[in-house]
Amino acid sequence: MKGLIEERIRRYEMRNFNYHENLEVPILSGCCMVMKDEAVTHCGMFDERFFLYLEDVDLSRRIHQKYRTVHFAGSSIVHQYQKSSYRKLSSLKLHLTSAIKYFNKWGWVFDRERKEMNRKVKISNHAKRVL
């Protein structure tokens, strides 16, 4: 069972991609986002219902519905990756609250749109490597 869960997480996080090359991705980390004014105008800013955690996932997903979202391999970011929601109960509560809001908004187990986004990105990135 543990192996099955780990495999689903690996696929969900797209860990098998080569992040040393530019890739179109459906979800971007909020620690560094650059976007066109046009995208913000059409898609809006961060959803204020998410106080912490998953606000970047929600925003980049909305942008990806209408625009390309790209991970640029040449960029470098230093992030104090602490996973506080794994260490502090108060942070875990915030994380779980945001996760519930996110899944209520986008779907829980069967998120067909996310599955389709991932499929298209896989095809697009594979085609770039073949060419």
Question: Which positions does each model-derived feature cover?
Answer:
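Active-site-adjacent helix/loop segment of glycosyltransferases
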Residues: D58-R61, Q65-L131
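Alpha-helix initiation/capping motif
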Residues: E24, L28, L52, S85-L92
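Aromatic-residue hotspot detector
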Residues: Y12, F50-F51, Y102
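A short, conserved alpha-helix in the catalytic core of glycosyltransferases
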Residues: N18, P26-M45, R49-S76
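Short capping/connector residues at structural and topological boundaries
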Residues: R10, G30-M33, Q82-K83
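Short, flexible, basic/aromatic active-site loop/helix in glycosyltransferases
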Residues: M1-V25
